[in-house]
């Protein structure tokens, strides 16, 4: 963390516009007013403290969920300026807390780089809180001011003397705005806190839950920064080279940090950040890194004779197989684009990342020939598998061209050709598949029965995956292609429903299918196309009356409502095959009465770790997970 000019005072605070609009249209400022928006408030305040840390003035940040679900954030930075603001005639801290776009981030003299737009954060949080209290330790005095829904209810008061500096912000989210929930999720906050600690080398971040019955505390501090992050992400994988490669450089005011390490898996995980903001959609910095990596590895392999003269170069996918990498850049003027504004658009970031990374990576490969050879060998194996997969794909295409219909024989397709209303049910077992085919609405519902369990794609390369019949049937039915051939626009169905039995085998098949979709068709999950059917667990019959219960709690409630006599008959479904076509339609497939769970992707890093832990080669992480969670099991299927 570097020291910068210590001229962070009231004159650096620029004012752009008023606050009234925030309460009317909160979604424009924090994305939404659901749980996501609620948690966003915390980051708006924490980002201010992180900016102080990046500038070299803050070493400790403390986040507390109070007993009443309010939030307190404490840092030991310089303290928000308290002098009178020249243009506004009010204390600078009040301007920051009550005026939108007032902050020390706009003309570059307060901070070189910053994450969220400073001051947008504080004032928006203030506007969306029933109460906000700010305490500033600065210039030997303790200053305090209180606000209600964005309006100051006290002047800035001096309440004591101090021998240190820093800012404490306490806020209570407004239930009128956050009508869905004002309940904070500790794990969600702790995950992001850990990420921020990795990205801000050396800073000490503590998070504490003070709510009754939920008390816990975590402290995060990583001297290794993103190098430690890569080690953390690879902790349950077999690594190809012991030490992660770490590269840092600066050019034209842009700082680039890259850490990478190869493991023995078949997928790559690259996470990129700009000013600590996760650029989920990638961008120019990520593109520069990928270009540089492919070029450096191919150049090295040719110089050392590991790729023969007439052989083609390794592709980008080849050199990235089994790669875990973090790219973190600090940019004074980042331009974000893409659907969710999480894609970096600055063209200079591509060139600078490529140049700085390539130079250092070349040096690493020359100085570490053993690790370099292992990296090249992994790429060569990936290339061979890619060629085999290409042949398998071509074979599939050739077969398709020779057949009258190129759709799998067991697929009962729907008559509609409109993907936006079409649904594909992937059903466990032929018997349930038969009932589903009879019970469905043929106009928009297609059925694809699966025989047995599909291949665990976490442990296999693409060539092996493509030789598996069940996987091939799914790929052909969905129409999107997979991997580098994937094209979402070719999807034949906008609802893909996984329908399996409610037992352990059904859960296993569901996990295998989700692993396949996540690894090779991630966009169908990201775009909300994947659903899980909820077949009932019980059938309750009393005379001619038939009711269904989807879990034990529902069954309990249902039995309470029924008369004592005659005694109701109870059937627990062991599998989908026990239901006839009509029952399956009424309970699980009829859009007017069914329950579907949509599969969403909140945190790619978390999802990746979960699939690796559940489906990967290492047994130890799975055993640890089972030991830690065994006490929560309600239904044990032995």
Curated annotation (Swiss-Prot):
GO cellular component terms attached to this protein's record: chromosome; cytoplasm
CDD domains named among the record's database cross-references: HATPase_GyrB-like, TopoII_Trans_DNA_gyrase, TOPRIM_TopoIIA_GyrB
Cofactor remark: Binds two Mg(2+) per subunit. The magnesium ions form salt bridges with both the protein and the DNA. Can also accept other divalent metal cations, such as Mn(2+) or Ca(2+).
Residues binding Mg(2+) 2: 501, 503
Compartments, record wording: Cytoplasm
Site, as annotated: Interaction with DNA: 453, 456
EC numbers for this chain: 5.6.2.2
SUPFAM superfamilies to which the protein is assigned, alphabetical: ATPase domain of HSP90 chaperone/DNA topoisomerase II/histidine kinase, Ribosomal protein S5 domain 2-like, Type II DNA topoisomerase
Summary of subunit composition and partner proteins: Heterotetramer, composed of two GyrA and two GyrB chains. In the heterotetramer, GyrA contains the active site tyrosine that forms a transient covalent intermediate with DNA, while GyrB binds cofactors and catalyzes ATP hydrolysis.
Function text: A type II topoisomerase that negatively supercoils closed circular double-stranded (ds) DNA in an ATP-dependent manner to modulate DNA topology and maintain chromosomes in an underwound state. Negative supercoiling favors strand separation, and DNA replication, transcription, recombination and repair, all of which involve strand separation. Also able to catalyze the interconversion of other topological isomers of dsDNA rings, including catenanes and knotted rings. Type II topoisomerases break and join 2 DNA strands simultaneously in an ATP-dependent manner.
Family recorded in the similarity comment: Belongs to the type II topoisomerase GyrB family.
Miscellaneous notes: Few gyrases are as efficient as E.coli at forming negative supercoils. Not all organisms have 2 type II topoisomerases; in organisms with a single type II topoisomerase this enzyme also has to decatenate newly replicated chromosomes.
Name of the protein in its database record: DNA gyrase subunit B
Organism: Bacillus subtilis (strain 168)
Gene label: gyrB
């Amino acid at each position: 963390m570097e020291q910068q000019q210590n001229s962070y005072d009231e004159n650096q605070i620029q004012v752009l516009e008023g606050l009234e609009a925030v309460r009317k249209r909160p979604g424009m400022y924090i994305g939404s007013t659901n749980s996501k928006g609620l948690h966003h408030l915390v980051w708006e305040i924490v980002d201010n403290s992180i900016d102080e840390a990046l500038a070299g003035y803050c070493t400790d940040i403390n986040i507390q969920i109070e007993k009443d679900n309010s939030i307190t954030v404490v840092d030991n930075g310089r303290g928000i300026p308290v002098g009178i603001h020249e243009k506004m005639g009010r204390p600078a801290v009040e301007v920051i807390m009550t005026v939108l776009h007032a902050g020390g981030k706009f003309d570059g003299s307060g901070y070189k780089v910053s994450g969220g737009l400073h001051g947008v954060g504080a004032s928006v949080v203030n506007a969306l809180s029933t109460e906000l209290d700010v305490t500033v330790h600065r210039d030997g005095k303790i200053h305090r001011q209180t606000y209600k829904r964005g309006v100051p209810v006290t002047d800035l008061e001096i309440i004591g003397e101090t021998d240190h500096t820093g800012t404490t912000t306490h806020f209570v989210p407004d239930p009128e705005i956050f009508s869905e929930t004002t309940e904070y999720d500790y794990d969600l906050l702790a995950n992001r806190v850990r990420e921020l600690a990795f990205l801000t080398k050396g800073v000490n971040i503590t998070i504490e839950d003070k709510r009754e019955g939920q008390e816990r505390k975590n402290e995060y501090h990583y001297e290794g920064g993103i190098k430690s992050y890569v080690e953390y992400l690879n902790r349950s994988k077999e690594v190809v080279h012991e030490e992660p490669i770490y590269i840092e450089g600066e050019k034209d005011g842009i700082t680039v940090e890259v850490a990478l390490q190869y493991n023995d898996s078949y997928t790559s995980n690259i996470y990129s950040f700009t000013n600590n903001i996760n650029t989920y959609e990638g961008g120019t910095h990520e593109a520069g890194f990928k270009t540089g990596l492919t070029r450096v590895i191919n150049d090295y392999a040719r110089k050392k004779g590991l790729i023969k003269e007439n052989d083609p170069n390794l592709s980008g996918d080849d050199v990235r197989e089994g790669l875990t990498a973090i790219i973190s850049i600090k940019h004074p003027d980042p331009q974000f684009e893409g659907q969710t504004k999480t894609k970096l658009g600055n063209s200079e970031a591509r060139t600078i990342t490529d140049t700085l990374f390539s130079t250092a990576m070349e040096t690493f490969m020359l100085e570490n020939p053993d690790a370099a050879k292992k990296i090249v060998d992994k790429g060569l194996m990936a290339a061979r598998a890619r060629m085999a997969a290409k042949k398998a794909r071509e074979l599939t295409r050739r077969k398709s061209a020779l057949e009258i219909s190129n759709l799998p024989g067991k697929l009962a397709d729907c008559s509609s050709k409109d993907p936006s209303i079409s649904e594909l049910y992937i059903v466990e077992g032929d018997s349930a598949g038969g009932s589903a085919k009879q019970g469905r609405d043929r106009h928009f519902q297609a059925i694809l029965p699966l025989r047995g369990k599909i291949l665990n794609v976490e442990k296999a390369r693409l060539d092996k995956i493509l030789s598996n019949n069940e996987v091939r049937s799914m790929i052909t039915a969905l129409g999107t292609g997979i991997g580098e051939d994937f094209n979402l626009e070719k999807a034949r169905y906008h609802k893909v429903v996984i329908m399996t039995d409610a037992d352990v085998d059904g859960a296993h098949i569901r996990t295998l299918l989700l692993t396949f979709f996540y690894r090779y068709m991630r966009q169908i999950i990201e775009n909300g196309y994947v659903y899980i059917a909820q077949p009932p667990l019980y059938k309750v019959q009393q005379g001619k009356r038939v009711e269904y219960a989807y879990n034990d709690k529902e069954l309990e409630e249902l039995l309470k409502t029924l008369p004592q006599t005659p005694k109701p008959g109870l059937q627990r479904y062991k599998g989908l095959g026990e239901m006839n076509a009509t029952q399956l339609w009424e309970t699980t497939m009829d859009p007017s009465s069914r329950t579907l769970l949509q599969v969403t992707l909140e945190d790619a890093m978390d999802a990746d770790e979960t699939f690796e832990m559940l489906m990967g080669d290492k047994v130890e992480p799975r055993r640890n997970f089972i030991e830690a969670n065994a006490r929560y099991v309600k239904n044990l299927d032995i």
